[in-house]
Amino acid sequence: MNRRTLLQATAASLALPPIAVWADAKNPTLTAATSEIQLLPEKYGKTQVWAFDGIAPGREIRVKQGQSVRRRVINNLSVPTSVHWHGIRIDNRMDGVAGLTQPAIEPGDQFDYDFVAPDAGTYWYHSHSRSFEQVARGLHGALIVDEAEPVDVDRDEVLVLDDWLIDPDTAQIAASFGAMHDLSHAGRLGNYVTTNGKYNLAKSVGRNERLRLRLINASNARIFQLALDGLEGWIVAFDGMPLSQPSPVQDTFVLAPAQRIDLIVDVTADVGSAGHVVQLDRNESFSQVAFEVMGESTRARRPAPLPLPPNLETKPDLSNARDVMLTMEGGAMGGMRGAMMGGQMSSMRDLMQSGNFWAFNGKVGSMDGEPLAIVSRGETFRLNIRNDTAFPHAMHLHGMHFHELDQNGHLGAFRDTTLVARGETKEIAAVADNPGKWLLHCHMLSHAASGMMARIDVI
């Protein structure tokens, strides 16, 4: 059964409730364990996933800006795990990178995470131990940090986009983790696309209702190309960080793995029809989320939204920036003949036999060893990322946000994950305001597992 057939089998899905929300309690836990969920239509049976508290995606964690997030993570899996709080400017020891900022949480053990959420916005949490497998099996969820004052919207909807590689004969997740093709090409791409764990998610709305849509790409490697239909929208934040002015959605927009986009949309579709967040895939389009218009809103159309309140930031000083170069090499059709690994030069054949296909600056990446850069606290650094591979890469920096620089070298979007197209060179700039050893890696998670990672040390 191909993806089209699998999607068609679910086309009659009914409207479903929102993902579960966990209001922050005094001593809450987060338990990683196997679970069975109805991921596919019922005729296919249930799918075994690895999940937090038995659901995938995991419960939404929601706090106010400046509040603490406390979770005791209990590992009831048969393998080690950890939890990374993606996009949070966090204390290094709470970052959740197994083998770098903490030991992995062994089976039967637990670990207490306790940190402040300094920035309002849309974030997420996910496993950071063999993440190319554990995230794909379902170990992730939304982390929402609310602004001090409510935003002028009628509803706030969190939409976790994902894809799953499913064997339709068994309804189980394909166990082909670490497959050579995934490691060396575009990554592990699923054949079943969901929102909040459901295909063809539908929600009831009123015409002229104003919604805040928080889109999170939790997939291993899929780049979502999206559009709006029957909705008038404005992008108000990237990766949790507000834009200085809302940007009207004129055409399509892209959401790479690990990225988030906050939209404010007005429902313009007629009563009895539906507005859609549309996924464009090659020459086809699908409804990612449908907003079924059941009646008129009690409110009239409003003017364009105001910008969200900004999060605190020290702007990069580009006149005194330290320049760091990062050249990405390797992969299928990349032409790389070899790279340094473990302190010695290895041929491409030897690299492939060890499951490594990619290199940064001629070295197979790792969390230990020499960092890509050592930067003083408060120093501005400008990272020049050159993609000499045949594939795009979503590059994520832990512990801090950065500005993408435009072609004129001016500060652009403030993000934690940037998409670098094949053959593209992109510059980003950040203020190293958070001390620690911070991972920099491709969030096509199979790529990170096969060489695409480095470290930036802030001292």
Set out the residue ranges of the language-model regions.
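N-terminal export signals
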Residues: T5-A23
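Extended terminal and domain-junction accessory segments
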Residues: P17, W22-A33, V135-D167, L243-R382, ...
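A long-range scaffold signal marking pre-active-site subdomains of enzyme folds
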Residues: W22-I88
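Extracytoplasmic beta-sandwich strand-turn segments characteristic of Greek-key/jelly-roll folds
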Residues: A56, I61-V63, G87-D119, Y199-L201, ...
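Asparagine-centered strand-capping/turn motif at beta-strand->loop junctions
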Residues: V73-L77, I216-N217, I385-T389
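Short, hydrophobic/aromatic beta-strand segments
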Residues: T81-H86, R222-L228, A394-L397
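Histidine- and aromatic-rich segments of cupredoxin/plastocyanin-like copper-binding domains
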Residues: M94-D95, P103-P107, S176-N320, N408-D416
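Hydrophobic or amphipathic alpha-helical targeting/insertion segments
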Residues: A117-D146
